[in-house]
From Swiss-Prot:
Residues 394-423 are annotated as: Disordered. This is SH2 domain-containing protein 5. The keyword NAD does not apply. May be involved in synaptic plasticity regulation through the control of Rac-GTP levels. CDD domains: PTB_tensin-related (cd13157), SH2 (cd00173). Its main location: other. Residues 398-410 have a biased composition (Low complexity). InterPro entries: PH-like_dom_sf, PTB/PI_dom, SH2, SH2_dom_sf. Disulfide bonds: none annotated. Residues 296-392 form the SH2 domain. It is found in: Postsynaptic density.
Amino acid sequence: MQKAGAGGRRASDCGLAPHRPRCITKFAQYVGLLPCGRPGHPGERVAGAAAAVGAEDCPRRRAVILKFSLQGLKIYSGEGEVLLMAHALRRILYSTWCPADCQFAFVARNPRSPASKFFCHLFVGSQPGEVQILHLLLCRSFQLAYLLQHPEERAQPEPCPGPTGEVPLKPLSSSGGLVREPFGRDQLSQNVHALVSFRRLPAEGLVGSGKELPESEGRARHARLGNPYCSPTLVRKKAIRSKVIRSGAYRGCTYETQLQLSAREAFPAAWEAWPRGPGGHSCLVESEGSLTENIWAFAGISRPCALALLRRDVLGAFLLWPELGASGQWCLSVRTQCGVVPHQVFRNHLGRYCLEHLPAEFPSLEALVENHAVTERSLFCPLDMGRLNPTYEEQDCGPLGRPPRTLRPLSHAKSEAELQGLG
């Protein structure tokens, strides 16, 4: 493998590309990388083992900036000047996170490397929410990339209850614009230095028309909702005065939309090929739920296709979607050694969530999933937060005569694992 120059590559030295895809920027600490086998093979639970060993053997950490897009993941130095690594999405095999250790890890191969040679890259944060969002962004990028490659397998529009089973999602109509929705108290960041962004939801009308609701109507809407958290200035001042802020990042109301805007910009031909109307990409962009719920349900893809992909995923991978025509009921499908096993999840009269034939009750679906991810005897196997990339390619199909683009490795990374460009 060709080594990169010692001087590194600065972002300003890469030249201006004709198109720079939209990306989502996050911060973390890079611990290191370890050679590993393919996830899902017997005895190889890459994420947990590599993360534990990496945390012990690599005490030297480095602050980095991660930039997510539908083309891949780029990692810059803490100052944002030096591009340290770049991973095309098609070369990333697997992503996972460990809330107990505040760790995020993904498994990728190098360009033109053997299909059996992988490296696990480990990152840590100061609290679980910081690393969880890294994992969620990468997983949803996997799914959106698959949807763009296989538009024939998209889900057909059908009425279904929302994430909590209380209010059904409304289809988009044909005129109007976007409105700003106030923040809920549980959506406020615990970080004073975090940027405040509005939650943008579809108004009744044509998405992307750029027309805003009249100011008077917007004020009336906020007054009806009775929520004071509608101004970024007020949100920031109240957070500072309350003195309850902790390190963290804004829980993403807009991450889903940002990823889909990245998809539209990175793959304009595939995006425009999607049909217009209720079943098109506009419904996928604006009418689904949160980032976590979209990943659990593989939002936008048909259920038969989602189940087929689940059968190829790692043991413990799961899908969770609301039952059609039933309020307060969900289907939890888990990939086990016996195949995909479905379980019924319901919400009782106390508003708590239960799994069929099990007495335990949980205040939310997230709590239910987290519990069964660490409990081994409740299901056929514990739930696994990791996800395989359905768009992963074992070989590079680019021009044979094109030399690989190399980048400067991290100072504490092994030379044999120097990372290369997105190419």
